[in-house]
From Swiss-Prot:
Top-tier EC class: transferase
Subunit architecture: Heterooligomer of catalytic and regulatory chains.
Family, per entry: Belongs to the aspartate/ornithine carbamoyltransferase superfamily. ATCase family.
One GO BP annotation of this record: 'de novo' UMP biosynthetic process
Protein name (record): Aspartate carbamoyltransferase catalytic subunit
Key words of the record: Pyrimidine biosynthesis, Transferase
Pfam families assigned to the protein according to its UniProt record, in alphabetical order: OTCace (PF00185), OTCace_N (PF02729)
Pathway where this protein functions: Pyrimidine metabolism; UMP biosynthesis via de novo pathway; (S)-dihydroorotate from bicarbonate: step 2/3
InterPro entries: Asp/Orn_carbamoyltranf_P-bd (IPR006132), Asp/Orn_carbamoylTrfase (IPR006130), Asp/Orn_carbamoylTrfase_sf (IPR036901), Asp_carbamoyltransf (IPR002082), Asp_carbamoyltransf_Asp/Orn-bd (IPR006131)
Record-annotated membrane-spanning stretches: none
Biological classification of the source: Archaea, Methanobacteriati, Methanobacteriota, Stenosarchaea group, Methanomicrobia
Entry annotated with the keyword Transferase: yes
UniProt-annotated binding residues for L-aspartate: 83, 164, 226
GO molecular function, one term: amino acid binding
Length: 303
């Protein structure tokens, strides 16, 4: 890695000024303020070792909108990784084929490892239960379109233990003034202790709720995540939790006026489709915001 090389691995590494710069840049791209030649002649390697729809496609769309090209890993089974090649060796080789790498990997810390051996910038597209900075930046971008990111109450509901999107978002929101985090999670799926301790150490107010009804009147943002069926060995327990944590139009009648509902997608049963047509439902708009925010990220690290 060269000294000047810029990576985006975790929002915890970023200053608020860096985040705000990317959000402003994304807003300009979203308004159509670009030529389509910003990254002409540049190549982005898209290395995904886990399934993805939105992250993979929006990074690809972002690169192409700026005039660049995509080098896609394709199926992991068709690569030398199945022969035992290490991630480090794979990254070293692919660095010679491209101008930047976006990496998704099931192992936490994989993106940081890749950045240490790569000769081009690395963007973390999600690593295990760790960080997902591009998702967090588009989450912030979506919130900022509805309200100022300060003096707000944000509810985080669902799988907070293994969900990398909520881990990243919590630390990003901690960089803004007077943001209070409300957690609503099943037993055993709240934030890990080390994350709670780290958040409290940097002054974040964490408020735990047993039921979503307790939190809704206070929230400006409700961020819902998918409960993962594989975390529940008992299918009856999963069904009970899924129904308890399901967001419905009737439930939202007690929400604070102006509250917005976000979800990193894909959703399963946690949000009733009847919510989709309500003014508070911003999750499809949130997904669409992935393109301008990733345009901003690619332009920043490559140019």
């Amino acid at each position: 890695m060269t000294h000047e090389q810029k990576n985006i691995l975790s929002v915890r590494d970023m200053e608020r000024e860096e985040i705000d710069k990317l959000l402003c840049s994304a807003a300009a791209f979203d308004r159509g303020n670009y030529t389509g030649r910003e990254l002409e002649g540049k190549i982005l390697a898209v290395l995904f070792f886990e399934p993805s729809t939105r992250t993979r496609m929006s990074f690809s769309a972002a690169m192409m909108r700026l005039g660049g090209k995509i080098l896609n890993l394709g199926s992991v089974e068709a690569t030398s990784i199945t022969k035992g090649e290490t991630l480090s060796d794979t990254i070293r080789v692919i660095s010679g084929y491209c101008d930047a790498i976006v990496l998704r990997h099931p192992k936490e810390g994989a993106a940081r490892l890749a950045s240490e051996v790569a000769s081009v910038p690395v963007i973390n597209g999600g690593d295990g239960a760790g960080q997902h900075p591009s998702q967090t930046l588009l989450d912030l971008f979506t919130i900022r379109e509805s309200m100022r990111i300060e003096n707000i109450d944000v509810g985080l509901q669902g799988d907070l233990r293994y969900g990398r999107t909520v881990h990243s978002l919590a630390f990003a929101l901690a960089k803004y003034n007077n943001v209070r985090l409300h957690t609503i999670a099943p037993d055993g799926l709240d934030f890990p202790r080390y994350i709670k301790e780290d958040l409290r150490d940097i002054g974040v107010e964490l408020i735990a709720h047993d039921h979503i009804e307790q939190a809704l009147p206070e929230l400006d943002v409700l961020y819902v995540t998918r409960l993962q069926r594989e975390r529940f060995p008992d299918p009856v327990a999963f069904a009970n939790y899924a129904s308890t944590y399901r967001i419905t139009p009737e439930l939202l009648e007690c929400a604070k006026p102006g509250m917005i509902v976000l979800h990193p997608l894909p959703r399963v049963d946690e949000i009733d489709p009847a919510v989709d047509s309500l003014p508070c439902a911003k999750y499809f708009e949130q997904a669409h915001n992935g393109v301008p925010i990733r345009m901003a990220m690619l332009n920043e690290v490559i140019n």
